[in-house]
Amino acid sequence: MTVTLTEKAEFRLRAFLRGSAKDANETTKGIRISVKDGGCSGYEYLMDVTSQPQPDDLVSQQGSVLVYVDAKSAPLLEGIVIDFVEGLVESGFKFTNPNATSTCGCGKSFKAGDCSPEGVPCS
C-alpha cells in the first residue's frame, strides 16, 4: 500500500497532530485515510486524527506522521499523493489519485474505474 505525503502535507499534519495532543507525552496520534460513497463524483475522501488504528487498517509512516489506511478503501487509495496547497481564497489538502477517472471541481470527491490488479471494479 503506497500513500505519499508531500513535504508540505507532512509538515502541516505534524504541526496539527502536535497541536491536537492532550499532553506532551501523546505521540502515537496519526491520520486515518478512507473513502466513502458520496460527494458529487461517487467517492469522498475522509481524513481523521486517530490514536488507534482499526484492526484491519494498513499502517505506514511518512516522515514523523503515522498513516492508517482503511483496508476496504486501500484499492481506491493505492498510489495516492496528498499535498497541502495554499491560495488566496482557500488552503487545504489536495489528493492526487491515480485510480480516479474523474474528480469534482473542489477535488474532494472522485469517480474510480478499474483500480485492482485483478481487474475487479472498485465499487
Swiss-Prot record:
Listed SUPFAM superfamilies: HesB-like domain
Q: What does this protein do?
A: May be required for efficient nitrogen fixation.
Entry's family note: Belongs to the HesB/IscA family.
GO biological process terms, alphabetically, are: heterocyst development; iron-sulfur cluster assembly; nitrogen fixation
What name has this protein been given in UniProt? Protein HesB, heterocyst
Q: Name the domain of life this protein comes from.
A: Bacteria
Q: Which InterPro entries match?
A: FeS_biogenesis, FeS_cluster_insertion, FeS_cluster_insertion_CS, HesB-like_dom_sf
Q: Name one Pfam family in it.
A: Fe-S_biosyn
- Cysteines engaged in disulfide bonds, as pairs: none
- Keyword Membrane on entry: no
PROSITE patterns attached to this UniProt entry:
HESB
What organism does this protein naturally occur in? Trichormus variabilis (strain ATCC 29413 / PCC 7937)
Which UniProt keyword terms apply here? Heterocyst, Nitrogen fixation
Membrane-spanning segments = none
